[in-house]
Curated annotation (Swiss-Prot):
Keyword Lipoprotein: yes
Stated role: Murein-degrading enzyme. May play a role in recycling of muropeptides during cell elongation and/or cell division. Preferentially cleaves at a distance of more than two disaccharide units from the ends of the glycan chain.
Gene3D superfamilies: 1.10.530.10
An MF annotation (GO) of this entry: lytic endotransglycosylase activity
Family statement: Belongs to the transglycosylase Slt family.
GO biological process, one term: peptidoglycan metabolic process
Alphabetized UniProt keyword annotations: Cell outer membrane, Cell wall biogenesis/degradation, Lipoprotein, Lyase, Membrane, Palmitate, Signal
Stated name of the protein: Endo-type membrane-bound lytic murein transglycosylase A
Membrane topology recorded in Swiss-Prot or TrEMBL: Lipid-anchor
GO cellular component annotations of the record: cell outer membrane
Localization terms from the record: Cell outer membrane
HAMAP family: EmtA (MF_01381)
Coiled coil regions in record: none
Length: 203
């Protein structure tokens, strides 16, 4: 009886210390990727304009909306790239020198939605995430920051942006994902990275 209890304790503790299983339940990207790829002419145009991979943009569309341009989430994220007007939308407007934020009807327009979402990815990459050296790690950081905010990601490394970037550069891409899985306050963050990568692999 005592031996059985000790064995259970070892298994329990091992489970507590392991990385969360963010790859379950399984997710099949085939249908959402097929629907997202119909917008490739727009994603290629926006990607080239902002220096962002069109494949990454298409993968985010597949994961976020499954290619549905009129989708509105419970948190009021709108359209193909599920943009929140008051956060990402407002940030892009500010960057462009415009006042206010995009309307819901603007965000339901596929071309405008993709343009704003791609611009936001570029702002993240060349702004708060600037300095991340490994391209694969930068992609993962972009994906997490797009869905949960760059601040939440960087604070898992340090309250100081420069120190956080340095710590990120000390990790391999796989170690970065493991860090996110163990430390990010949003439990869906590592799964989001995985789903976007699955979508890119399915193209």
């Amino acid at each position: 009886m005592k031996l059985r209890w000790l064995m259970w304790l070892v298994v329990f503790l091992a489970g507590c210390s392991s990385t969360p299983d963010y790859k379950n339940p399984p997710w099949n990207p085939e249908v959402p990727v097929k629907r997202a790829m119909q917008w490739m002419p727009i994603t290629e145009k926006a990607g080239n304009a902002w220096g962002v991979s069109p494949r990454l943009v298409t993968a985010i569309i597949a994961v976020e909306s499954g290619g549905n341009p009129t989708l509105v989430s419970k948190s009021n994220a709108v359209g193909l790239m599920q943009i929140k007007a008051s956060t990402a939308g407002r940030e892009v407007y500010r960057y462009m020198g415009w006042s206010g934020q995009p309307s819901s009807s603007e965000l339901k327009n596929p071309e405008r939605n993709i343009s704003i979402g791609t611009a936001y990815l570029s702002i993240l990459e060349h702004g708060v995430l600037k300095g991340i050296e490994a391209p694969e790690t930068m992609q993962y950081a972009l994906v997490v920051s797009y869905v949960n905010g760059a601040g939440a990601l960087l604070r898992t490394f340090s309250s100081d942006r420069k120190a956080a970037i340095e710590k990120i550069n000390d990790l391999s891409p796989d170690e970065f994902v493991e860090h996110v899985a163990k430390n990010h306050p949003a439990p869906q963050a590592p799964r989001y990275i995985w789903k976007v990568q699955q979508a890119m692999n399915a193209m």
